Amino acid sequence: PTDEYDIIELYDRDWEYNDWPKQEIMDVIDNGVHMIHHLGHSSYVYAMKMYYEDCYGLSNTDFCFIYSQGCMAGGFDYNYADCIAEHFTVKTDTGAFAVIMNARYGWFWSYSTDGDSQRFHREYLDAVYGEGIPEIGRANSDSKEDNLPIIGRSCIRWVYYEANLFGDPSLRFYEYENTPPNTPNIEGPPNGKV
């Protein structure tokens, strides 16, 4: 909902030569964005116009969540290098606290917003915002459960298996502002004497 969130959009069509520069998304991440939803091309070592080496150029300390429909960015079994999902989450001290990325192809339908990867992405957002499921792992599972009735359609079955979560599945999106508990005042005998 736009009345509750600041939404930043990066569309190729809005840039000279229909190509926004990678520094745009890097600046968004460095400025503390909470969520990124990516619909675009990827590979094992490339997503959101960034190559895995670019993850080391990030300086953010407020980590984000990324959901990408791109191909292969979550291919953790790639033989030649760690996939970019791993670089966003565990290979650097910056980037994302969690990502959902495809181990293989992202599946779309030309001229439609009902592609197979988009169905899982939409159901993920429905789980978080519509069904009130704040845990990132439960929301990912729910997106898969909600697509079971059409498991035989096109490439739904493939996306079911390949849309993988990198990160702690028990992490929750904020439902309210977190405040740390009060530090307990521990009183007792000094120096271990009773």
Language model region names:
Residues P1-P180:
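Cysteine-dependent hydrolase recognition
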Residues N178-N185, P189:
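Proline-centered linker/hinge motifs at extracellular inter-domain junctions
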Residues G192-V194:
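Structural beta-strand segments of beta-rich domains
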